[in-house]
Amino acid sequence: MSQILRRYPLLNDASAMYIHEKDNWTAFRWNATELTAILEEVNRKQGLLYGRLSSLGFDSKLKAMAENLTYDVVYSSEIEGIRLNVDEVRSSIARKLGIENVKQTAPSHYIDSVVAVMLDAVNHYDQILTKEKICAWQAAFFPTGFSEGSQIEVGQYRTNEEHIVSGMFGREKIHYIAPSPERVDEEMAHFLDWFNSQENISSVIRSAIAHFWFVSIHPFEDGNGRLARILSDMLLARADKSEFRFYNISSQINKDKNRYYNILEKAQHGDGDITEWIYWYANTLSVALDEAENIVSTILNKSFFWQKVSSVPLSQRQTDMLNLFLDGYEAKITSKTWASLAKCSKDTAIRDIQDLVDKDILREDIPGAKRPSYSIIYDPEDITVFFSDVTIEQQNGNHYIKAMYKGRLKVCERILPLDAERFEKGDLPLENLLAKYCSYLRIS
């Protein structure tokens, strides 16, 4: 546990309102017994994820990381109320990573700056973190020196008091008052010493502590939350010993922002026992790993498909449309949908689709239907013979296909709501559903 001692007096514990007002406040405590199960779950999921990723080639791994980083950047900003264009972020990341065949959308200078910060942290996870580095990252978030129309201090620690408030003007509620600006330099020196040190505790706990500690210091006038999430990711990367990042916590925090802020506030008003915060953080990370599994499944299924049809001649439009649906675009493949998305005539769409049917790349879901829809043929072999006990279940608002593969491997894959609905209605055959979500199991 952290044992950083102070060299100046603070309030006695009885009169302290915020955690940083207590003497030796960074000697955080937690109940290891209460955390054992969730930490084991996270470690198990990390192992499974990286085990699956071992079957991917370098290019596929790079694409998986790019997709993860895209949503990390987007959702970390959205937590702070900043909406970024997903295509611009994806394009910026792809260009910086040297990934081809990604829709090119010219990103703004701001998005390029934010992406550069994330990639710097990811690519140099094992380097010493310095005051100069973290100040440069904060400055990159605010290239104009303004935030929400107000000029702020950038590239340096704050020199003003920092109050975390909510509510209308005149009716503000103060949630937290950060350490005084006179303390920030020394507080951050203590934090950076700890961050760069080696400590024999769980990487998940270290990541959670870094997040909590940094936002509690609140060293900058703005950008603290985004930086805290980057720093916690860096510690996870150090533990993984890999610059490849395939999961992030930002997307899950964004779905539960109120709980995120409430549990931070509770810990910041506490006595140094941050068990509840660490548990919430680890549980949120566990959900993030589930999300990463879904992304990896999509990439593996897509890779399996293109291996099968690599020698089949296709037009660029057909390739682009197939990639769109392989990436999980939620719509039935019909001539109307095809024409709309490909921006071509319906007659052209019909010819494209019929050509793919003739080449055994698409097949009708219900042969002879008045308004035909189609599914991608991932594998010409009927893979239903390899599965038993297939069910569609709903959990926490998501739909999953569950089955037993070859009588020995339990499979659970999240599926699109539209596919679940179509399957229940009988519009989507089981063979097509299993092929779409479970073909990766056929990779030898």
Give, region by region, the residue ranges found by the protein language model.
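Acidic, low-complexity, intrinsically disordered interaction modules
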Residues: 404-422
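FIC/Doc superfamily catalytic core
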Residues: 1-400, 412, 428-434, 440-444
